Amino acid sequence: MRFTSCCGAVLICAGASVAGAQQFPPEQIKEGAAIYAKHCATCHGNHMKNPPWAIDLATFPRDERARFVDSVTNGVRNMPPWGDVINPEGIAALWAYLVDGEK
């Protein structure tokens, strides 16, 4: 009984992590790539491999979407705010590109 309960808990957790995986439509990723190339690559690098002065987006935590949205919208440290330039849909597309675009 105990073994069955433990196996069930493991399977539930494994299913939750797969179910929680983010998947984005290819069009959204493509839009995010275009926005990234236009507004972000200068500082963050062509493939999210940053120069020494910017955060390495290739390793940005994929479970911190809210932090990403806030940083892009309002700026953080030396990064200017982009909320007046990139609309919420564009920021969502950037997130899709960050998560799924550079595999």
Protein language model features and the residues they cover:
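Electrostatic cytochrome c docking/interface patches
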Residues: C13-I35, K103
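Disulfide-bonded cysteine motifs in exported proteins
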Residues: G8, I35-K38
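Axial heme c-ligation environment in periplasmic c-type cytochrome domains
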Residues: P51-A58, T73-K103
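Bacterial N-terminal signal peptides that target proteins for export
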Residues: M1-G8
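Short cysteine clusters
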Residues: C40-C43
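Gly/Gly-Pro-rich "capping" loops immediately C-terminal to redox-active cysteine motifs
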Residues: P26-A33, G45-V76
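A cross-family signal for key residues in well-ordered alpha-helices
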Residues: V10, V69, W95
